[in-house]
Amino acid sequence: FTKKKERPCVFEYVYFARPDSYLKGKCAYEYRKNFGYELAKESDDVGDIVVPVPDSGVPAAIGYSQYKKIGFELGLIRNHYVGRTFIEPKQNIRSFGVKLKLSSNKSSIKNKSIVLIDDSIVRGTTCSKIVKMLYDGGAKEVHVRISSPPIKFPDFYGICLLYTSDAADEYS
């Protein structure tokens, strides 16, 4: 076989690869932390605390928090017995999965202005539910920051996004 140029899916760097995996000689955790650092450079100074969407948003949130010198809090607690919600085939299952998967940590978010960091938005299902969850938990403000560019087109080989109209970018 002829050796072909490697063309990894960008989602390997953003989400799929384990944080301790190496991609092109660099740890995925470091890529993700750097994404948060770069995001912080572009963002306004808002928020009392930085809250990651667990678990994949944690490295970017750490980078963001370190750059902005804003406290890092686990404002969302993940149930590790619930799997990936964005790959479920139906919207109602995805929405229900978010409620099972995450809960707000009220003691760390009450009356706080939150900078919420997630790695990506595929459809927007998770993000909108989480923002509501944080407000219901007592957050004063929620400022969403995403550490990867918007997903605009279908991916027939990787993430479960078959139609352009499903992308969260369609709603912005």
What are these regions, as identified by a protein language model?
Residues 1-46, 83-94:
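Active-site-facing substrate-recognition patch
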Residues 47-54:
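Short glycine-rich phosphate-binding loop at a beta-alpha junction
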Residues 57-61, 79-85, 122-125, 149-154:
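Flexible loop/turn segments at secondary-structure boundaries
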Residues 64, 120, 142:
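Hydrophobic, well-ordered secondary-structure elements that form the walls
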Residues 69-115, 152-159:
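Short, glycine/charge-rich flexible loops or terminal/linker lids adjacent to PRPP-binding catalytic cores
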Residues 113-127:
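Phosphate/diphosphate-binding loops
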Residues 132-162:
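A short, conserved beta-to-alpha structural element at the edge of catalytic cores
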Residues 163-172:
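Single conserved hydrophobic/aromatic residue that forms the stacking wall/gate
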